Amino acid sequence: MQFNFITIFPNLIKPYFDDSILSRAIKSSIIKLNFINPRDFSADKHLKVDDYMIAGGAGLLMKAQPVFDAIDSLDSTHIIYLTPAGKKFTQNDAKRLSKFENITFICGRYEGIDERIIEEKVNEVFCIGDFIMTGGELGALCMCDAITRNLNGVLGNPNSLDIESFEYGMLESPSFTKPNVYNGLSVISAFLKGNHGKINALKNNMALCKTRFFRPDLYQKLRSPKKQKEKR
């Protein structure tokens, strides 16, 4: 899969891929990266990519021309724009988007991008949460990371995907490692007795409790009549 990042700050993104799982994915040719700077396409003699908003408004906006031309320089691709106005990105989106061969992230700056770019060029609009950031680069990295983990050959143990949070609509159960006792704090005794049926039942119950406490919104969806019917 190829990921394209349209950004005026490519050096904010590149270091994230220098280590760990994503670095291995690049070395294994599972993913490829391409960075496109709108300044390289600016028709302005000073290579400006921003301007004041028509009809007023605070701050500057990324101009249509450089971004249009940056997009047109790419082959066929699925284009995503990161903005607080977008739909919230979820694990289901990550799994779905992992089926694409080529994805492009438009990383906005200032007050965003000219609306005509969204209307004419963008396939999907996402946000990663109800908060404001200085640009779309971190959001694009979050999405790229989540999507990449769903590609074949990226994770050492592909079964890890089956037991992660959100896979079954709830958070993952609490996890422990050795030693069994640390600073007087013990691992749950049932986890040490080898009864896998009881362990799985306990983990499921703990996952439900964790979801109810930390993510009541997810818990309500689990308890909805539609979800209950699906379980049957």
UniProtKB/Swiss-Prot annotation:
Disulphides: none
One GO MF term attached to the UniProt entry: tRNA (guanine(37)-N1)-methyltransferase activity
SUPFAM superfamilies on file: alpha/beta knot
Entries under Gene3D superfamilies matching the protein: 3.40.1280.10, tRNA(m1g37)methyltransferase, domain 2
CDD domains according to UniProt: TrmD-like (cd18080)
E.C. code: 2.1.1.228
Listed InterPro entries: Alpha/beta_knot_MTases, tRNA_m1G_MeTrfase_C_sf, tRNA_m1G_MeTrfase_TrmD, tRNA_m1G_MTases_N, tRNA_MeTrfase_TRMD/TRM10
Location (main, coarse): cytoplasm
Catalyses which reaction(s): guanosine(37) in tRNA + S-adenosyl-L-methionine = N(1)-methylguanosine(37) in tRNA + S-adenosyl-L-homocysteine + H(+)
Record-level GO cellular component terms: cytosol
One BP annotation, GO: tRNA N1-guanine methylation
Key words, A-Z: Cytoplasm, Methyltransferase, S-adenosyl-L-methionine, Transferase, tRNA processing
UniProt subcellular location: Cytoplasm
Family per similarity comment: Belongs to the RNA methyltransferase TrmD family.
Subunit structure: Homodimer.
NCBIfam families (UniProt xref): PRK00026.1 (NF000648), trmD (TIGR00088)
Primary role: Specifically methylates guanosine-37 in various tRNAs.
Protein name listed in UniProt: tRNA (guanine-N(1)-)-methyltransferase
Organism: Campylobacter fetus subsp. fetus (strain 82-40)
Lineage start: Bacteria, Pseudomonadati, Campylobacterota, Epsilonproteobacteria, Campylobacterales
